[in-house]
Amino acid sequence: MIRTLLMLTFWALAAPLAALIGFPASFIMGDVRVLYRLFMWGAWAGVWVTGVRVETVGLDQFDHSRSYIFMTNHVSNIDPPIQIPLIPRRTSVMVKKELFKFPILGRAMRMGSLVPVDRSNRDAGIEAVRAAKSVIEQGLNMAIYVEGKRSFDGKLLPFKKGPFYLAVECGVPVIPVTIVGTHYIMPKARFAIKPGLVKVIFHPPIEPQDFGDRESLMEKVRAAVESGLPEEFRHPASARADVRGKGTEAPEGTAYA
């Protein structure tokens, strides 16, 4: 609990400082990258002070000048502040609309082109996918936690179909990502953070010409993400078809759950 409070206190102190520097600099320069980098540094540093250390795999195997959709598993609230700062270029995410109500955070997220999503409203989910498409067309990356919510036991949940609709519509490469370790550090049912090692695996990009249809792309992403999980978090072969077959129909996606 102390480590969690330390992280939250650090963020509470760092956010106004980042805003004090980043907002004027962004307005003067007409570029939000200063603000973005400050907030990414703050997110990373906040995780670091808790004793969490991160190992990355595969960051050197894709072109950092291109836009990608990163499709990632989700087991902990600490996943986004670990993953997003690792990605070299500006990256947007879909986040709960409630987070936009916080004055400094909400303003920064709007300037950073983050996409609000209302998970209780199917039509709002569709609108969020359209907004995400617009963000990608601006040249930004998009990170999506394709299960739509956190997994309680660390195993993959059914994937939302919206992210795959988005990928096919935009025609940009998809990078499957596996996050390993946050289930132990801060699982869904616990607020306290334990120190430990997190591994973030960036799998090889899936190029648009290799997508096939949306179902085929979903299968490829799921296979890649699951391949990076420890054996105890992989579904038995006999159960995989059932899990894959339960994907929701609405185009949805959210970064936090």
Question: Residues of each region from the PLM?
Answer:
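Short, hinge-like loop/turn segments at secondary-structure boundaries
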Residues: 73-74, 110-112, 192-195
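Non-catalytic C-terminal accessory region of glycerolipid acyltransferases
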Residues: 126-257
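A transmembrane-helix-recognition feature enriched in membrane-embedded lipid enzymes
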Residues: 1-55, 107-111
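Generic preference for hydrophobic
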Residues: 56, 70, 93-94, 200-202
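Generic beta-sheet signal
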Residues: 66-72, 91, 135, 140-144
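Short gly/ser/thr-rich secondary-structure transition/capping motifs
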Residues: 50-57, 125-126, 182-184
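Membrane-embedded segments
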Residues: 77-131
